[in-house]
Amino acid sequence: MNHVKVSIYINEADKWQHRPLHLELLSMLDKNEIAGGTVLRAIAGFTMKSPVVCTSLVDVGSNLPLVVQFIDSVEKVDAVLPKVKEMAGKRLIIREPVEVLNGCHLVS
């Protein structure tokens, strides 16, 4: 079976309908029965439009980079990608083939 991993690069402050984008993406993926999703919080990062930002022990309201990742079959990923693109706007989305060796229902 062919599997795909999608990574969506966003920031902590990004919103979807006034709610945190990363949580809304995970909720949408869960409702669409995607095998699994994860949000990774960076300790530092930059983009073409913003300088390097990094975390410190005193930062409470920082705007650090986040990566939302999910993995499932090509068919299931293709089904949710239009909504992911709508929610992510112009943010970077990467799709890559993966070989799932172990874990949940993806391995037969």
Regions found by a protein language model. Give the residues of each.
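Positively charged, small/polar-rich N-terminal and surface patches that mediate targeting and assembly
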Residues: 1-108
